[in-house]
Protein backbone atom coordinates (compact mmCIF):
# COMPACT_ATOMS: atom_id res chain seq x y z
CA UNK A 1 0.00 0.00 0.00
CA UNK A 2 1.18 3.52 -0.78
CA UNK A 3 2.06 6.04 1.91
CA UNK A 4 -0.06 9.17 2.39
CA UNK A 5 2.40 11.24 0.38
CA UNK A 6 2.62 8.68 -2.45
CA UNK A 7 -1.17 8.47 -2.61
CA UNK A 8 -1.48 12.26 -2.62
CA UNK A 9 1.04 12.62 -5.46
CA UNK A 10 -0.65 9.94 -7.56
CA UNK A 11 -4.04 11.56 -6.98
CA UNK A 12 -2.74 15.00 -8.01
CA UNK A 13 -1.92 13.53 -11.43
CA UNK A 14 -5.20 11.63 -11.84
CA UNK A 15 -6.86 11.56 -15.27
CA UNK A 16 -9.37 8.74 -14.62
CA UNK A 17 -12.47 10.78 -15.54
CA UNK A 18 -13.46 13.96 -17.34
CA UNK A 19 -13.54 16.04 -14.14
CA UNK A 20 -9.77 16.44 -14.49
CA UNK A 21 -10.34 18.61 -17.57
CA UNK A 22 -12.13 21.39 -15.68
CA UNK A 23 -10.53 21.31 -12.24
CA UNK A 24 -8.27 24.00 -10.86
CA UNK A 25 -6.98 21.81 -8.03
CA UNK A 26 -7.37 18.25 -6.86
CA UNK A 27 -9.05 18.36 -3.44
CA UNK A 28 -7.32 15.42 -1.77
CA UNK A 29 -8.33 15.94 1.86
CA UNK A 30 -7.27 17.74 5.01
CA UNK A 31 -6.75 17.02 8.68
CA UNK A 32 -5.01 14.49 10.91
CA UNK A 33 -4.05 11.45 8.90
CA UNK A 34 -4.24 9.23 11.99
CA UNK A 35 -7.61 10.55 13.19
CA UNK A 36 -10.19 8.10 14.46
CA UNK A 37 -13.00 10.17 12.93
CA UNK A 38 -13.28 10.90 9.22
CA UNK A 39 -15.82 13.08 7.42
CA UNK A 40 -16.64 12.32 3.78
CA UNK A 41 -18.45 14.95 1.73
CA UNK A 42 -19.82 14.80 -1.79
CA UNK A 43 -17.54 16.80 -4.05
CA UNK A 44 -15.61 20.06 -4.11
CA UNK A 45 -17.42 23.30 -4.86
CA UNK A 46 -15.98 26.41 -6.45
CA UNK A 47 -14.13 27.64 -3.35
CA UNK A 48 -12.77 24.17 -2.63
CA UNK A 49 -11.54 23.84 -6.22
CA UNK A 50 -9.75 27.19 -5.97
CA UNK A 51 -8.11 26.44 -2.61
CA UNK A 52 -7.56 22.68 -2.99
CA UNK A 53 -9.14 21.94 0.39
CA UNK A 54 -12.55 20.42 1.25
CA UNK A 55 -15.33 22.43 2.88
CA UNK A 56 -13.85 25.95 2.79
CA UNK A 57 -16.83 27.92 1.47
CA UNK A 58 -20.06 28.79 3.29
CA UNK A 59 -20.87 25.10 3.74
CA UNK A 60 -17.44 24.52 5.24
CA UNK A 61 -17.87 27.38 7.68
CA UNK A 62 -21.14 25.85 8.89
CA UNK A 63 -19.57 22.38 9.11
CA UNK A 64 -16.70 23.82 11.16
CA UNK A 65 -19.23 25.42 13.55
CA UNK A 66 -21.14 22.15 13.94
CA UNK A 67 -17.93 20.23 14.56
CA UNK A 68 -16.67 22.81 17.06
CA UNK A 69 -19.81 22.36 19.18
CA UNK A 70 -18.54 18.85 19.96
CA UNK A 71 -14.80 19.70 20.05
CA UNK A 72 -13.91 18.42 16.58
CA UNK A 73 -11.44 20.46 14.53
CA UNK A 74 -9.93 19.77 11.12
CA UNK A 75 -6.44 20.75 12.27
CA UNK A 76 -6.60 18.78 15.52
CA UNK A 77 -8.56 15.53 15.59
CA UNK A 78 -10.45 14.69 12.38
CA UNK A 79 -9.85 14.15 8.67
CA UNK A 80 -12.07 15.46 5.87
CA UNK A 81 -12.27 14.14 2.31
CA UNK A 82 -14.83 13.96 -0.50
CA UNK A 83 -16.38 11.22 -2.58
CA UNK A 84 -14.77 12.80 -5.66
CA UNK A 85 -11.54 14.79 -5.67
CA UNK A 86 -12.38 17.23 -8.48
CA UNK A 87 -15.21 19.74 -8.79
CA UNK A 88 -18.19 18.65 -10.87
CA UNK A 89 -19.25 21.44 -13.29
CA UNK A 90 -21.89 23.83 -11.93
CA UNK A 91 -21.63 22.06 -8.55
CA UNK A 92 -23.83 19.22 -9.81
CA UNK A 93 -23.88 15.87 -8.02
CA UNK A 94 -20.94 13.64 -8.94
CA UNK A 95 -22.00 11.06 -11.54
CA UNK A 96 -21.75 7.36 -10.61
CA UNK A 97 -18.86 6.85 -13.05
CA UNK A 98 -16.99 9.82 -11.51
CA UNK A 99 -17.51 8.39 -8.04
CA UNK A 100 -16.26 5.03 -9.25
CA UNK A 101 -13.18 6.60 -10.85
CA UNK A 102 -12.35 8.27 -7.52
CA UNK A 103 -13.27 5.36 -5.27
CA UNK A 104 -9.76 3.90 -5.08
CA UNK A 105 -8.36 7.21 -3.78
CA UNK A 106 -10.88 7.41 -0.97
CA UNK A 107 -10.76 3.69 -0.20
CA UNK A 108 -6.97 3.95 0.14
CA UNK A 109 -7.31 6.99 2.41
CA UNK A 110 -9.68 5.00 4.62
CA UNK A 111 -7.30 2.01 4.62
CA UNK A 112 -4.34 4.21 5.61
CA UNK A 113 -6.31 5.94 8.35
CA UNK A 114 -8.15 3.05 9.96
CA UNK A 115 -10.88 5.37 11.30
CA UNK A 116 -13.33 4.07 13.88
CA UNK A 117 -16.10 6.40 12.71
CA UNK A 118 -16.90 7.85 9.29
CA UNK A 119 -19.45 10.64 9.02
CA UNK A 120 -21.08 10.72 5.59
CA UNK A 121 -21.91 14.37 4.97
CA UNK A 122 -24.86 14.44 2.59
CA UNK A 123 -26.77 12.00 0.44
CA UNK A 124 -24.05 11.15 -2.09
CA UNK A 125 -21.49 9.84 0.40
CA UNK A 126 -24.16 8.17 2.55
CA UNK A 127 -25.53 6.32 -0.47
CA UNK A 128 -22.04 5.22 -1.41
CA UNK A 129 -20.92 4.03 2.02
CA UNK A 130 -24.04 3.23 4.05
CA UNK A 131 -26.80 2.16 1.66
CA UNK A 132 -27.67 2.99 -1.94
CA UNK A 133 -31.19 3.77 -0.71
CA UNK A 134 -30.07 5.98 2.20
CA UNK A 135 -32.39 8.93 2.88
CA UNK A 136 -30.76 11.65 4.96
CA UNK A 137 -34.07 13.06 6.19
CA UNK A 138 -35.11 9.65 7.55
CA UNK A 139 -31.83 8.01 8.61
CA UNK A 140 -29.54 10.85 9.73
CA UNK A 141 -27.80 10.39 13.07
CA UNK A 142 -27.98 6.59 13.05
CA UNK A 143 -24.85 4.42 13.12
CA UNK A 144 -24.20 1.50 10.76
CA UNK A 145 -21.37 -0.99 11.20
CA UNK A 146 -19.59 -1.78 7.93
CA UNK A 147 -16.50 -3.98 8.25
CA UNK A 148 -15.69 -2.74 11.74
CA UNK A 149 -16.15 0.96 10.96
CA UNK A 150 -19.18 2.85 12.24
CA UNK A 151 -20.79 5.07 9.61
CA UNK A 152 -23.24 7.86 10.33
CA UNK A 153 -25.04 9.96 7.74
CA UNK A 154 -25.93 13.58 8.36
CA UNK A 155 -27.20 16.60 6.47
CA UNK A 156 -24.87 18.36 4.06
CA UNK A 157 -24.24 21.91 5.29
CA UNK A 158 -25.39 23.28 1.92
CA UNK A 159 -28.79 21.67 2.58
CA UNK A 160 -28.83 23.29 6.02
CA UNK A 161 -28.10 26.69 4.48
CA UNK A 162 -31.04 26.19 2.10
CA UNK A 163 -33.30 24.76 4.80
CA UNK A 164 -32.28 26.17 8.22
CA UNK A 165 -35.14 24.39 10.02
CA UNK A 166 -33.05 21.18 9.71
CA UNK A 167 -30.18 22.64 11.78
CA UNK A 168 -31.53 21.37 15.14
CA UNK A 169 -31.64 17.81 13.76
CA UNK A 170 -28.08 18.19 12.45
CA UNK A 171 -26.97 19.47 15.86
CA UNK A 172 -28.51 16.36 17.46
CA UNK A 173 -26.54 14.23 14.98
CA UNK A 174 -23.34 15.85 16.22
CA UNK A 175 -24.32 15.24 19.85
CA UNK A 176 -24.85 11.55 18.97
CA UNK A 177 -21.46 11.58 17.21
CA UNK A 178 -19.76 13.05 20.28
CA UNK A 179 -21.35 10.40 22.48
CA UNK A 180 -20.18 7.63 20.14
CA UNK A 181 -16.66 9.10 20.01
CA UNK A 182 -16.53 9.14 23.81
CA UNK A 183 -17.68 5.52 23.83
CA UNK A 184 -15.29 3.96 21.30
CA UNK A 185 -12.38 6.26 20.45
CA UNK A 186 -8.99 6.11 22.15
CA UNK A 187 -7.62 9.57 21.32
CA UNK A 188 -8.54 12.51 23.49
CA UNK A 189 -11.36 14.44 21.85
List each language-model region with its residue ranges:
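A polyanion-binding, active-site-adjacent surface
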Residues: 1-189
Amino acid sequence: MATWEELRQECLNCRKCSLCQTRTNVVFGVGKEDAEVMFIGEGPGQQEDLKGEPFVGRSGQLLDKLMATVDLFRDKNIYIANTVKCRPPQNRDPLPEEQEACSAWLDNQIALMHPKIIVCVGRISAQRYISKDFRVTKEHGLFYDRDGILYMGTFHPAALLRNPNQKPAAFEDFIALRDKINEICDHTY
